[in-house]
């Protein structure tokens, strides 16, 4: 078996991982169960049961890559990894289209975010050996970029016309099925708020739901990594709820990963609202996987990747416009019609059986059993310089305050 180096950009030690952190925790578990020796690098050297752990640093990249057969990286940490690590067959996880998500921060942070995202993505596409994505839309998006960088080239195409040796689908997964508890509350969960969501619309939706179901509530959760995840929309939602004096809107801490099932089981239904954009076309809402795992029917704005799942498994309702009343009517219908509610929970259970992590990560498991360098990248790919992000004024101030 292989010695696998997982390079996770998010802290894991606090036990409250978000999407990227959750994915790395589950990747570690699956590869460990396959018999691999797994070492996880993260900003805080957070532990994953059965795996060794260390901090992200230039020194750890150099030292641990020498002793590894394969590496898995995601996001901006790839810049430092490719700059300081010994060459090792590397899987780049592209399930999170961060360059598109972060366009929402233009007004707040200007061009710097896009420039750094672009540099990161182009460098990773050129230097990675194998790539993972979460949907067919993502696969085509990244293949287009790979043509531009030379990674999709005639030599590779002649050998592998379907490009499966270059990029494969490995969507999010869920943990083992769990029994569903009887549910009689009217509490609605939104979860964490990112700046591409529309939490104010969700508040208005539940305000309308309360005209028919007076005890309905809405809960948002605070992100566990606010220092690296802008919280503009969360602040907007808090201000809006205070202005309206809505006591049915709650803002609670992010649930610990090991305890999230018990937390989700308090709710009857999940709600997601967001505007339609390229981000929704490419995204795979990872929380939807967790909500289905816990049997929550879902009412959501339209995002093609997850729309298809909810429709296929009859596990939720997709609203294709921005109308508050349409979202509210769907929620009232599900909560009042027990047959509909139960059918959606049954569909969610079928989804869980078919989306276990060991199944969704099959392409990664195959690569780790036989790691390899992709030699055509040396012949066709452009080679942009690797540049680590210079510290911003805010970074320097934070370090000075900690000193």
Predicted regions mapped to residue ranges:
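Membrane-proximal helix-turn-helix segments that form the acceptor-binding/catalytic region
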Residues: 111-131, 139, 155-161
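Nucleotide-sugar-dependent
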Residues: 197, 256-263, 270-290, 300-308
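C-terminal amphipathic helix plus adjacent low-complexity
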Residues: 162-163, 350-403
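Nucleotide-activated donor-binding/catalytic signature segment of Leloir-type glycosyltransferases, i.e.
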Residues: 222-224, 231-264
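Conserved donor-binding/catalytic core segment of Leloir-type glycosyltransferases
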Residues: 5-8, 171-198, 202-210, 218-222, ...
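Conserved acidic donor-binding segment of nucleotide-sugar-dependent glycosyltransferases
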Residues: 312-313, 317-324, 333-338
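N-terminal subdomain of nucleotide-sugar transferases
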Residues: 1-45, 201, 208-211, 391-403
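Active-site proximal beta-strand in glycosyltransferases
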Residues: 4, 85-108, 113-115, 125, ...
């Amino acid at each position: 078996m292989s010695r696998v180096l997982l390079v996770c950009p998010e802290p894991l030690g606090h036990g409250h991982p978000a999407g990227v952190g959750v994915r790395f925790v589950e990747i570690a578990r699956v590869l460990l169960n396959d018999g691999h020796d797994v070492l996880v690098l993260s900003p805080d050297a957070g532990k994953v049961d059965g795996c060794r752990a260390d901090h992200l640093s230039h020194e750890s990249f150099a030292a641990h890559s020498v002793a590894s057969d394969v590496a898995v990286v995601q996001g901006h940490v790839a810049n430092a990894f490719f700059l300081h690590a010994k060459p090792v067959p590397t899987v780049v996880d592209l399930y999170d289209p961060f360059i598109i998500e972060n366009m929402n921060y233009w007004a707040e942070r200007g061009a710097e975010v896009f420039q750094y995202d672009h540099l990161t993505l182009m460098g990773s596409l050129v230097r990675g050996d194998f790539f993972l994505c979460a949907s067919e839309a993502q696969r085509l998006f990244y293949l287009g970029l790979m043509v531009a960088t030379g990674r999709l080239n005639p030599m590779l195409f002649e050998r592998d016309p379907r490009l499966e040796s270059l990029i494969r689908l490995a969507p999010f997964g869920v943990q083992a099925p769990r029994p569903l508890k009887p549910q009689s509350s009217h509490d609605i969960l939104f979860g964490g708020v990112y700046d591409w969501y529309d939490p104010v619309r969700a508040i208005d939706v539940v305000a309308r739901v309360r005209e028919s179901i007076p005890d309905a509530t809405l809960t948002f959760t605070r992100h566990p990594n606010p220092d690296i995840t802008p919280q503009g929309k969360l602040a907007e939602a808090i201000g809006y709820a205070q202005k309206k004096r809505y006591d049915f809107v709650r803002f609670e801490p992010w649930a610990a990963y090991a305890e999230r099932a018990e937390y989700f089981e308090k709710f009857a239904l999940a709600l997601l609202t967001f505007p339609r954009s390229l981000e929704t076309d490419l995204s795979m809402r990872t929380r939807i996987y967790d909500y289905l795992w816990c049997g929550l029917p879902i009412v959501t704005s339209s995002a093609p990747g997850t729309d298809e799942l909810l429709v296929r498994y009859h596990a939720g309702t997709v609203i294709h416009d921005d109308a508050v009343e349409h979202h509210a009517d769907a929620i009232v219908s599900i909560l009042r019609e027990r047959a509909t509610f139960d059918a959606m929970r049954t569909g969610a259970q079928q989804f869980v059986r078919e989306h276990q992590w060991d199944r969704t990560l099959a392409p990664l498991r195959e690569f780790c059993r036989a790691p390899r360098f992709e030699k055509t990248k040396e012949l066709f790919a452009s080679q942009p310089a690797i540049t680590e992000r210079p510290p911003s004024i805010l970074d320097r101030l934070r370090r000075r305050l900690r000193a």
